[in-house]
């Protein structure tokens, strides 16, 4: 088995190669909004470094959002392309599942990612050992976020939420890697071809022409 994992849901992109014995290699970089010109090149370079031929790839996993509109679109396009070319399954991994993963089976946690315009993607995870892709995220106004025992989001979003959440225990997100995408995908029950994105928010609109 050779699994390719792709994460382009934020400004930090990453790709990983996973084999029968675990992680083979992974790379991450600050891509900004340049996902389309960098991700496939980085994957090709990683495969060459590990002497892996594209035809030997047997499974693909990709972060399907919510997150960066352009990044998600690029990552899913590459994943679907690999799946079609090799006639292999592709597994979608929810980006909020990645944030909640460190607390899986330990205690309940609410996780969020900013969607802009005063709204966020919000999901509540139970203390049980939940299964990937079973917790639904909601597009929620920031002012409507309920209190939670433990909350995980980036520091910029927490700065907006802290005044209304009071004594909620805040956890910054742990460093999410493309290897985590692979790990979650291997525990996921369903494969999809093609993968559909989870956007929730509105796309960023270009400025009007002067």
Q: What role is predicted for each listed range?
A:
Residues 30-38, 69, 73, 77, ...:
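Residues at secondary-structure transition points
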Residues 1-64:
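N-terminal beta-alpha supersecondary unit
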Residues 1-22, 34, 91-210:
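Oxyanion-binding and handling regions
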């Amino acid at each position: 088995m050779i699994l390719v994992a792709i994460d382009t849901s934020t400004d930090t992109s990453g790709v990983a190669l996973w084999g029968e014995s675990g992680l083979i290699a992974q790379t991450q970089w600050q891509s900004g909004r340049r996902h389309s010109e960098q991700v496939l090149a980085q994957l090709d370079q990683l495969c060459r470094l590990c002497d892996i031929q594209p035809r030997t790839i047997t499974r693909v996993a990709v972060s399907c959002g919510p997150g960066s509109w352009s990044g998600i679109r690029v990552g899913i396009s590459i994943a679907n392309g690999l799946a079609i070319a090799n006639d292999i399954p592709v597994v979608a991994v929810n980006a909020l599942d990645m944030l909640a993963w460190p607390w899986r089976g330990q205690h309940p946690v609410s996780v969020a990612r900013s969607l802009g315009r005063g709204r966020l993607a919000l999901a509540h995870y139970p203390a049980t050992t939940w299964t990937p892709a079973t917790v639904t995220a909601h597009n929620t106004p920031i002012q409507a976020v309920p209190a939670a025992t433990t909350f995980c989001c980036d520091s910029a979003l927490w700065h907006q939420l802290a005044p209304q959440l009071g004594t909620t225990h805040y956890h910054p997100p742990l460093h999410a890697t493309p290897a985590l995408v692979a790990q979650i995908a291997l525990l996921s029950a369903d494969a999809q071809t093609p993968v559909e994105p989870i956007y929730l928010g509105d796309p960023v609109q270009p400025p009007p022409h002067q």
